[in-house]
């Protein structure tokens, strides 16, 4: 008797100095799960970053990293440890590899017990395949560690790694992850029923066309792997929607063209997305978060979707979010009004900089301050309020060759004109023009991807060519300024007497003036 092919799906933990888990979900992996089910697979999910009902995940100290350096170490004791100004504590957010190994061994023991008493279709078997999603390139180490754990517990299973990291840097993934004789495929070449592919570890780049239009298989969060509900298991209280993929522009720091194999924009049929919203709303989910490369490029389709949501009285109480940002030139008055009516309580606008030269250097030719003001005026006309968290602006800093005065000018402008400022430290992304432009510096420093995390200020030394006395404290002061200005629009206050690095740096600036 032949049995259906089984796959264990794993979303790894992450190693970082900070992590915001509010709308964290392995939506690519969950869409692939829906696709695999159409192929007859039996599935089980382990989301190492599964957030609790307060949208937080556990964290454990892992090591100390020095800013703009490859130096790292573990202190003899964490209890009395205090990092220096140029050091950052790196945490493991989510389920640790050690805890994951215990979980896998439980699955193994249960499967073997069921096998001894004849095959039980209600028990998830030892997996034929293990599918692992890998997101940011600078988080690649946790993917490696998850693979190592899986190898120890399920040595016969073949492994598939997909996501942003293996798409942007497949050679790095092949070289570093410890895969066995891996085959590199584009998503469009993937055939899970091909016997040759079934025998090989795979590195999968780009998207799987057959999975793109499918809904997320959230039911895996409450199933034991064989379609049976787990005791006390619940669906997440939010979900992710993707109604389009791709972007026709090619900003110097952005990888969307590589992730989507070109500039073509794929749009999901709005009726399908609407049915998904209805289904999940009826299951009790109220928050829906759009993750798109450029939300309003498929504007006609998107507007049809949110118009149906706005007009559906059964969806009263829904909350919609677009935290990736909205293209300012496309935020027309009617669009802003419809978004507000449908349930978008907040807008996120990619201001990034008010400096025209920097916009040009970043190849952001499709936006400028006139278009930003256009979007801002339309948002206000639609009922969004300024100088509160209704409208939020992203500000990009920590870039090579940046003009620090322009960053300060942008912060002051955004705070006074808009209100809520969201600081974004720059991380160079492999395969982008900006990464290639500064590749010599990156290689000279000996940086691997984990050292390029923006929170580690990888271009601090580079920018000292322009600002000789530039220090970590200057960036802490800049962050402190943003948090201080944000206190007028947020419920929480900035503790000027506090003990964290940002608060200390800001206090030093005040006492020096």
Report residues per predicted region.
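Acidic, low-complexity intrinsically disordered segments
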Residues: 2-283
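Hydrophobic/aromatic residues located in beta-strands of well-ordered beta-sheets
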Residues: 7, 159, 288, 320, ...
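C-terminal accessory regions of radical SAM enzymes
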Residues: 8-15, 24, 390, 404-513
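A structural motif corresponding to the C-terminal end of an alpha-helix
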Residues: 38-43, 153-154, 282-283, 312, ...
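Short, solvent-exposed turn/loop segments enriched in Gly/Ser/Thr/Pro and often Arg
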Residues: 165, 293-297, 325, 398, ...
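Catalytic cores of alpha/beta
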Residues: 170-175, 334-335, 400-415
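Glycine-enriched alpha-helix->loop->beta-strand junction motifs that scaffold or abut catalytic
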Residues: 179, 340-346, 416-420
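Radical SAM [4Fe-4S] cluster-binding motif and immediate context
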Residues: 223-386, 397, 412
